[in-house]
Amino acid sequence: MRLAIDAMGGDHAPKEVVLGAMDAVKELDVEITLYGDENQISPHLTNNKNITIVHTEEVITSNDEPVRAVRRKKNASLVLMANAVKEKQADACISAGNTGALMSAGLFVVGRIPGIDRPALSPTLPTVDGKGFLMLDVGANVDAKPDHLLQYAIMGSIYSEKVRKIQQPRVGLLNVGTEDGKGNDLTKKAFELLQSAPINFVGNVEARDILNGVADVVVTDGFSGNVALKTIEGTAETIFSLLKGTLMSSTKTKLAAALVKKDLGGLKDKLDYSEYGGAGLFGLAAPVIKAHGSSNARAIYNAIKQAKHMVEFEVTPTITATVESIGKVEEE
C-alpha cells in the first residue's frame, strides 16, 4: 500500500512527521512518500526503508488563503501529495498542515465521490468509556442542507462499521433537545431523512451527552460541529490546567498528586487526540486524512494506520456504492 504524506505540514514538521512515518513502516505494511524539503527531512530520516522523498521547497503556510494557495502553489508539498493520489501513485494521503488548503486540494485535486455534495471533516473523539465516537462535520462546510446531513450519516456509519468495527453503529443528530421535532428547520428536515435512511438512527442527541457515548456517530453542520469540537478541546485543557494548579498549590496536594500521578496519566491518555489518528475528509474519491496541527510522531503514526485501514477495508468504494444505490432507489 502506498501512502503520500505532506512532510512540511504541522507545528512540529518535518521532524515528528518523519518519526511517525518511520514507526509506521516498521510496524505496518506500507510504502510512504514524503513530500517536502529534503534538506530538512533527511537529518531525521535514520531509516529510509520503504520511505522515499520527493523534494520541494514550496510550502503552504497557515497564513495562506487556502483556495488561492492550492491553485497558485502547484509545487507545494501538500498539492504534490494530493496530485499523487489523483494520479494513482498513492492510495491515500495525510497532512497536518493548513486545514482549508487540504480541503481545497481534496475537492479540486483528489475530487468528490459522485453523489456526495460536500465532504465532511470527521474526527474520532474520546468518550468516558474509552470507545470514542465519530463526529461530522466539524468545519469542512459551515452551512449544510438536510441532504448533506443524510450523506454525513451514511458515510460516518460506513466508516464506523468498517474501520472501527462497530456493528450497527448508532447515529445521532446533534440538537438542542432529544425530543422529536426539536431544533431548527435544518435539523427537523434532517431528522425525517435520517429516520428512513439505511442506518441505525437513534434520534436527537444533546452536546452534553456525546462524551458519555450516547451515539457512535454524531451528525451536525460544520458550524455547530466546529463549535462543539473547540468546546470539548478547550474544556479538557482548562480542566487539566485547573487540576494541575490545585495539585501543585501546597506540599499536601503535591504529595497527593504523587499518589495519583499514574491514574491522572491514564485519564489524560484517554482524552489524547493522538490515539485516534486524524480527521478523515469523507466524501472524497480517496482517503484524505487531516492530522492535528500539533501532531507528534504518535499522532502521525495513528493517522497513517487510519489511512491504511480506510484503504484496506474499502471505505471509499463502499460509500460510493451505497450512495449510488440510494440514488437509484430515489429515481424509482
UniProtKB/Swiss-Prot annotation:
Q: What is its EC number?
A: 2.3.1.274
Protein family per UniProt = Belongs to the PlsX family.
Query: What is this enzyme's catalytic activity, as reactions?
Result: a fatty acyl-[ACP] + phosphate = an acyl phosphate + holo-[ACP]
* Pfam families reported in the protein's UniProt record: FA_synthesis
Q: Which PANTHER family match?
A: FATTY ACID/PHOSPHOLIPID SYNTHESIS PROTEIN PLSX, PHOSPHATE ACYLTRANSFERASE
Q: Which gene encodes it?
A: plsX
What keywords appear on the UniProt entry? Answer: Cytoplasm, Lipid biosynthesis, Lipid metabolism, Phospholipid biosynthesis, Phospholipid metabolism, Transferase
Could you tell me what this protein is called?
Phosphate acyltransferase
Tell me the GO molecular function terms: phosphate:acyl-[acyl carrier protein] acyltransferase activity
Assembly, per entry: Homodimer. Probably interacts with PlsY.
Q: Which GO terms describe its cellular component?
A: cytoplasm
What is known about what this protein does?
Answer: Catalyzes the reversible formation of acyl-phosphate (acyl-PO(4)) from acyl-[acyl-carrier-protein] (acyl-ACP). This enzyme utilizes acyl-ACP as fatty acyl donor, but not acyl-CoA.
